[in-house]
A protein has these predicted regions:
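Accessory "access/gating" subregions that flank catalytic or transport cores
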Residues: 5-126, 132-161
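Intervening/peripheral non-core polypeptide segments
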Residues: 20, 186-188
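Flexible glycine/proline-rich, aromatic-decorated loop/lid segments
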Residues: 153, 157-161, 165-185
Length: 188
């Protein structure tokens, strides 16, 4: 809790718990039922081109083909194309590269969950490349302390330093001809 947060940042004197005053009044409340939110994926060429994972899996070929056509219309060149449909193997989407990054994607919980999923599996040797950028140095330190970094590296992930950049494309760029998925904030 609060004691940990003061210690991990090394600035105990600067720490102040943020909370509403006793007599605080609000104009309204926004309640979000997080159990109703479904995981989504945004496809090229805009974050609004988004689908739930369930919808994508149920209509994989149709959605990817439509995305390829939309990109072709946008680019307007016959010598340049997007090939997503070739990433369908046995009715499932094959991903070649992944990035977990930034202040929104590189949170402790997100990285911990990825390490838990990957534990005992390997994605190295050309099968799947994963780069992980913790959102801050304190998050990196806690991931090291708890052994999460060890588990990620044992699974073939590359762990990089925290920096502001992966969200807008600095750092790992999509590999040539690869399908790359990213857990990060989207800047448009």
């Amino acid at each position: 809790g609060d004691v940990y947060k003061r210690q991990v940042h090394g600035r105990a004197a600067d720490y102040k718990k943020l909370a509403p005053a006793d007599l605080a009044y609000y104009d309204g409340v926004v309640e979000v039922d997080l159990s109703a939110i479904r995981p989504m994926i945004a496809l090229p060429m805009h974050p609004s081109n988004a689908f739930t994972i369930e919808e994508l899996n149920a209509n994989l070929e149709d959605i990817l083909h439509a995305c390829e056509q939309d990109v072709q219309k946008l680019i307007g060149r016959k010598d340049v194309s997007l090939d997503l449909c070739s990433k369908i193997e046995n009715g499932k989407l094959r991903v070649d590269q992944g990035v977990i990054a930034g202040c929104a994607g590189g949170l402790y919980d997100s990285i911990y969950e990825a390490a838990s999923i990957l534990k005992g599996h390997t994605g190295g040797c050309g099968d799947y490349a994963l780069s992980v950028y913790p959102g801050s140095q304190p998050i990196m330190m806690e991931l090291v302390r708890t052994g999460v970094i060890h588990d990620l590296m044992a699974s073939g992930a590359t762990v990089r330093t925290a920096f502001c950049g992966p969200c807008f494309g600095a750092g790992d760029v999509p590999a040539n001809g690869a399908l790359s998925i990213r857990l990060s904030l989207i800047h448009i």
